[in-house]
Structures are given as C-alpha cells and as structure tokens.
Amino acid sequence: MSTAALVEGKIVQCIGAVIDVEFPRDSMPKIYDALILDGSELTLEVQQQLGDGVVRTICLGASDGLRRGLTVKNTAKPISVPVGKPTLGRIMDVLGRPIDEAGPIESDVTRSIHQKAPAFDELSPSTELLETGIKVIDLICPFAKGGKVGLFGGAGVGKTVNMMELINNIAKEHGGYSVFAGVGERTREGNDFYHEMKDSNVLDKVALVYGQMNEPPGNRLRVALTGLTMAEHFRDEGLDVLFFVDNIYRFTLAGTEVSALLGRMPSAVGYQPTLAEEMGKLQERITSTKKGSITSVQAVYVPADDLTDPSPATTFGHLDATVVLSRDIASLGIYPAVDPLDSTSRQIDPNVIGEEHYSITRRVQQTLQRYKELRDIIAILGMDELSPEDKLSVARARKIQRFLSQPFHVAEVFTGSPGKYVPLKETIRGFKMIVDGECDHLPEQAFYMVGTIDEAFEKAKKIQ
C-alpha cells in the first residue's frame, strides 16, 4: 500500500503511554491495526474503538514530545516483524528493528505478531524427554521435548542464572534454532546473554528480541509476541525451536500498567481484568504442531514469594513442568535453589520416564518429606530423641539435599569451580545409591557442589 493511500487521523489526547486518535468516521482503524506518527517511526497499536471516529491506542515507544493535533497514519494492518534465518544472530526490538548496529535485517518474509493458536487437530503432544544436565531438574521435574516449563521464584533466588544454564546446556547440545525474548528485564542481563552466546559460538543460531525494563509498557507488553512470532515461523518450517522468555511476570505487569489508562476496572490485587485472556492468548500459541515443535522455558517472577498471587497462579495452569525456586533452600547455600517437594512435571509417570526413574524420584521425595516433618522435633529436642530409623532418614535426606546442588557453567566466573553437566543415567544412579544406603558411611559435606556420585566419593577421601 502506498503512503498516499493511508488514511490520516489526528491525536486528540495523550495520557502516558495511551494515545487517543480521531479518524474520519467511515474509515476507523480495526483493533490491533498499527498506526504510524507522520514524520517519525513511532508506532501506535489500536486497542479500543471509542466511537465518533476516536480510537484508543498504546504507544510502542517513548511518548515524549507528542501533542494534540499531530497527524497519524493508519497502515491498515497489524504490527509485522521480519522472520526467518536473517533474524538469527541479531538483536531486535518489539517492532523487529535491529538494535545491534549491524545493519538492516535482510528478510523478505514478515509476519503479524497477532496470530491464532494452532487448531486442535494440528497439535502434537510429545513424551520424549529433554535432558538438561541439571540433576535436580532431570530427576524431580523432567522436561518434555516440545513442552512448556516455568521457572518460578522471588527476587534474587536464581531464575535468570538457571535460565542461562539451561540455555547453555540445551541450546548448545540441541543444535537447532533458539529465540530469546527479554521481556522487561535488566538491560545488563540482555548484554551478558548476548556476549555469552557470542563467546560460545551459538549466536548464529539465536534470534534475540529485547524490550527491557527502561522501555515503555507498550514495548514490554508486545515483545513476548514478537519473539513468539519468530519462533512460530521456524516451527512452521518444520524445525524444533527453543523459546526462552525472561520474564513472563513483566509481560503481565506491562498489561497492568496500561489497563487502567485504557479505562478498565482493575481486578484482584490491582491486575487487569483481562489477565487470564492475555496470558491464554500468549501461552496457547506456544505449542508443538505436526510440523515442528516449540520447547519453551519461561522465567516467572513471584511477587513477595507468594505463589498464590494472580500472575504466577494464572501461569501455572499452562505449563507441563514447574521448577519452583525457594528462598529457604537458597539461604542454605544450595544452588540451584530448586524446591524438590514443590516442583512438578507431567512427565513423572512410570509409563513415560520408566519404572526405575519414577521410583527413585518418589523415594527421594519421601525421604525429604520425612526430614521436613522431623525438623521441628529436631529444633526443639535435638537429634538424640529420634528413633534409629528417623536418624537414618535425616542423614540420607541431608545428603540428598546437598547432592541436589551442582556447580553451573555460567557461574564459573563467580564461583571459580568448573561447571558440571550430569547425564540422566548418572543422576539416577547417584540418587539410587544414596536412598539404598550405599553412601551412609560418607560425610554429608562430600555431596555438596559435585557432579556425579563418583565425585562425591573422591571428595570424601580428601576430607577424611
């Protein structure tokens, strides 16, 4: 469509990131149409039609300097972003424009960021396991290839570090394409991630889309859809894609920021009334079809460590595996701080993971649960008052707890200890030996921050 044919309107009101634009009554823009400010690259997205030719829009960029009377043009189509191989190795913003100063993106194919979720008969569920090399995840909450995983945790318990380690272990081993959407997170983390990918020579297989903390709410609200659109394109070409989102909570928060300005009545805890619908629209598109798969890992910030908060609670229902990071475990110095009693996976089924893996997982959880029940008694009366069986359970549980810790590759520069990738077979063998009592003679500190069980035996020799 030539620029001459674009219908023009005028800005009539600006309130923060929400802009009202008046158009001729016979040519009002549709919902989700992209409008462009005349003489600049600023894009507005239509959210509501208020009547009398006025539409209410969200500004995808800084609204500084906007005033009433400025001319806006209707592109008559939703926001479209470049997709395909030219996006790999590049950093883009919410509109698919490059922000890495490496020249334009030479892509002939663009795709609207608003797509329908695949039809029911196109879906292709999978039970194939995806090995991560992280003991606690592979044992307690294994991931399915083409599944959805959430990393839940409060501030500072290690969501981003866990996400980086998963990217390091899966994306490098995976060999396929990955898409990373940085939604409302720190710019520093985006920069670190870019250099991490560059140094490990996998940047040419990753598309990066950033809408960071310092950007207006419109950008943060839509950047997850931009990243997802790129991942969907690779999936529809028959590829297996990894899709990483950090952080889903900021996507919700951006919606909350603009919801009140759009004139909606807030619902529980001040969230937007459309929270479940917005989350559903995003999550239902992150799925595997008969053409290809999207395996997604999403970090989810938990406000005030409250998992019943509407935002994380709405996210739970969409996931195949939930990895819950606990402040209590982090305070013991055990990293990754995954709570083995709170984390779950739909793959924990003897028909999927096998009888041995299933029984070891359940025995590990039973031992830890027993220790949790006895902790109050130990705190009041001490260990001496416990029965011999309970003393043994506590000793094994403390060893399991320490053996669930593991040095990460991405944390090597901070900790000084080299990262460990532990194959699933080794993980199962190690925990089987602990619950079977084959390690009862070893000191518990031998299990802290090691990879396989053999390393624990070696460490015990050094300690003794």
Curated annotation (Swiss-Prot):
The answer on whether this UniProt entry bears the keyword Amino-acid biosynthesis reads no
Query: What keywords does the record list, in alphabetical order?
Result: ATP synthesis, ATP-binding, Cell inner membrane, Cell membrane, CF(1), Hydrogen ion transport, Ion transport, Membrane, Nucleotide-binding, Translocase, Transport
Its primary localisation, in coarse terms, equals membrane
Can you tell me which residues bind ATP? 153-160
Question: What domain of life is recorded for the organism?
Answer: Bacteria
Q: Where in the cell is it found?
A: Cell inner membrane
Q: Which InterPro entries match?
A: AAA+_ATPase (IPR003593), ATP-synt_VA_C (IPR055190), ATP_synth_F1_bsu (IPR005722), ATPase_a/bsu_AS (IPR020003), ATPase_alpha/beta_chains (IPR050053), ATPase_F1/V1/A1_a/bsu_N (IPR004100), ATPase_F1/V1/A1_a/bsu_N_sf (IPR036121), ATPase_F1/V1/A1_a/bsu_nucl-bd (IPR000194)
Transmembrane domains' residue ranges: none
What membrane topology does the UniProt entry give? Answer: Peripheral membrane protein
Give the Enzyme Commission number. Answer: 7.1.2.2
**CDD domains of this UniProt entry?**
ATP-synt_F1_beta_C, ATP-synt_F1_beta_N, F1-ATPase_beta_CD
Q: Name one GO cellular component term.
A: proton-transporting ATP synthase complex
Which reaction(s) are listed as its catalytic activity? ATP + H2O + 4 H(+)(in) = ADP + phosphate + 5 H(+)(out)
Identify the enzyme class.
translocase
GO terms assigned for molecular function? ATP binding; ATP hydrolysis activity; proton-transporting ATP synthase activity, rotational mechanism
Q: Which family does it belong to?
A: Belongs to the ATPase alpha/beta chains family.
Q: Per its UniProt record, what HAMAP family does this chain match?
A: ATP_synth_beta_bact
Which proteins does it associate with, and in what oligomeric form? F-type ATPases have 2 components, CF(1) - the catalytic core - and CF(0) - the membrane proton channel. CF(1) has five subunits: alpha(3), beta(3), gamma(1), delta(1), epsilon(1). CF(0) has three main subunits: a(1), b(2) and c(9-12). The alpha and beta chains form an alternating ring which encloses part of the gamma chain. CF(1) is attached to CF(0) by a central stalk formed by the gamma and epsilon chains, while a peripheral stalk is formed by the delta and b chains.
Q: What is the name of this protein?
A: ATP synthase subunit beta
In the UniProt record, what gene is named as encoding this protein?
A: atpD
